[in-house]
Amino acid sequence: MSVEFCDTNVVVYAYDTSASAKHVQARQLVERLWLEGTGALSVQVLQELFVTLTRKIPQPLTAPIARTIVADLATWHVVAPTPSDVLAAIDATVNWKLSFWDAMILVAAQRSGATLVWSEDLNAGQSFDTVTLRNPFADA
């Protein structure tokens, strides 16, 4: 069974009802990953998700509701960063010309065993070692 890693923006759209078409597409993707048991995230994604859902979307969720969402998603395969991951991300910022936080996402995805990363922010179709990026909103 292959693992698929989700970047924060995709998971946010799954719970942001004001995102219209992106909400529907992201929701379908997240639901499929739930049913298949193939979803992977990082601690960074869970942290960013909570902040975004409670502070940055047009209709912010309450902290208790966002906490429940984070707790539910924490049952997926979640990668916690290690010092080695930080060093690998630093190297990736140099080698791949990425921001540090994007590099941390890719390092976590690689460590999760994922070969596919769902993201709106990174370059769809681009590969980084064993991981390929895909934009769920560009495919529709």
Predicted feature descriptions by range:
Residues M1-L41, K56-P64, A140:
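Short, well-structured N-terminal submotif of metal-dependent ribonuclease cores
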Residues V3, L106-A140:
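Acidic, PIN/NYN-like endoribonuclease modules and their adjacent C-terminal/linker elements
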Residues D7-N9, E48, D102, D121:
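Acidic active-site catalytic centers that drive phospho-/nucleotidyl reactions
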Residues A14, R32-E36, T52-K56, D72-H77, ...:
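Alpha-helix C-capping/helix-to-loop hinge sites
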Residues Q28, Q44, E48, T68, ...:
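Amphipathic alpha-helical interaction segments
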Residues L41-V43, W118:
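Short beta-strand segments at enzyme active-site cores
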Residues L46, F50, P58-A71:
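Glycine/small-residue-rich phosphate/adenosyl-binding loop
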Residues W76-E120:
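Active-site neighborhoods of divalent-metal-dependent phosphate/nucleic-acid chemistry enzymes
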